[in-house]
A protein has these predicted regions:
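Histidine phosphotransfer helical core of two-component systems
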Residues: 1-47
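A conserved beta-strand-to-alpha-helix junction within the catalytic ATP-binding
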Residues: 39, 71-86, 138
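Short helix-loop "hinge" at the ATP-lid/N-box region of the Bergerat-fold HATPase_c
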Residues: 125-126
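Short beta-strand-loop-beta element adjacent to the nucleotide/active-site pocket used for signaling
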Residues: 137, 141-151
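Acidic ATP/Mg2+-coordinating residue in the GHKL
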Residues: 155
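Short conserved segment of the HATPase_c
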Residues: 160-172
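Detector for a conserved hydrophobic position within an alpha-helical segment of the HATPase_c
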Residues: 194-195
Length: 230
C-alpha cells in the first residue's frame, strides 16, 4: 500500500508541476501579447482622446460664436474672397486646381462671420475636388431685388448625393467617401453663422459633377439692440 500511495503522490506532484509550468507558459504568452498590443492600444486611446478634444473645441466654438456681438461694416467681398483663395494657393497649386473670384457685390455685415463662412466653403471645395480632372472653383455673386445679395461657391468636385443635401448641414454629419479629415462640424457651423446674419444657405449638387453652395444675405445687416425686437 505504501508503494501505491507513493506512486499516486508522485503522479500528483508531476501533474502539479506540469500544470504550474503550463500556467507560467500561458502567463508568458499573455504578457507577450499585451506587450505587442500595448503600442496599438495606446495609439488608439490617444487618437480617440484627440478626436474628443477636437469635438469639444468645435462645440465650444459654436457656442462662443453664437454669443459674440455682431459688428456690421461695409465689406469688400471681392477682396475678401481673393485673400481666402490666396491662403489655400499651396493646396490648389499642388493639385493643379484654380480658383476664380468674379467681381462680388459689397455687403454691410459682420466681417468675422463672413470670413468664416466663405473661408469654410472654399476650404471644403478644395478638400473635395475630384483629382481625376483639373479642379475648378468659381466664386460669384450679384445684388437681387428687395435688398438682398446672393453669393455662390461652385466647384467641379466629387459632388453630393441628393439624400445628403440637407444632412450635410447637421452636426456631426458627413457624406460620401470618408477619406478626408474632419468631424462633420464645418457646414453646421456655416449654417449657424449664416442664420445669425439673417441669411440662408442651400446646395445644388450631383455626384461626380460638383457642388454649388448658394448664400443669400440682406444687403444691410440690422443688429437689434438688447431688449429690442426687430
Amino acid at each position: 500500500r505504501k508503494l501505491v500511495w507513493q506512486g499516486d503522490r508522485s503522479r500528483v506532484v508531476d501533474k502539479a508541476i506540469a500544470d504550474a509550468e503550463k500556467t507560467r507558459a500561458v502567463d508568458a504568452d499573455v504578457v507577450m501579447a499585451v506587450r505587442e498590443d500595448m503600442p496599438e492600444a495606446i495609439g488608439f486611446i490617444r487618437a480617440s482622446t484627440e478626436k474628443m478634444d477636437r469635438l469639444i473645441n468645435a462645440i465650444l466654438k459654436l457656442s462662443r460664436e453664437g454669443r459674440r456681438n455682431l459688428l456690421p461694416e461695409t465689406l469688400d467681398m471681392t477682396a475678401m474672397a481673393e485673400n481666402i483663395a490666396k491662403s489655400v494657393h499651396h493646396q490648389t497649386e499642388a493639385s493643379g486646381a484654380r480658383i476664380e473670384v468674379q467681381p462680388l457685390p459689397e455687403i454691410e455685415s459682420d466681417r468675422i462671420s463672413m470670413e468664416q463662412i466663405v473661408g469654410n466653403l472654399i476650404d471644403n471645395a478644395v478638400k473635395y475636388l475630384d483629382h481625376g480632372r483639373p479642379g475648378e472653383i468659381v466664386v460669384s455673386g450679384e445684388d437681387t431685388p428687395g435688398g438682398w445679395v446672393v453669393y455662390r461657391i461652385a466647384d467641379n468636385g466629387r459632388g453630393i448625393a441628393p439624400r445628403d443635401h440637407e444632412r450635410i448641414f447637421e452636426l456631426f454629419r458627413r457624406s460620401g467617401k470618408q477619406d478626408r479629415s474632419g468631424e462633420g462640424l464645418g457646414l453646421a457651423f456655416v449654417r449657424n453663422s449664416v442664420r445669425r446674419l439673417g441669411g440662408t444657405i442651400d446646395v445644388e449638387s450631383e455626384l461626380g459633377k460638383g457642388s454649388t453652395f448658394l448664400l443669400k444675405f440682406p444687403k444691410r445687416l440690422i443688429v437689434a439692440e438688447p431688449g429690442v425686437a426687430l
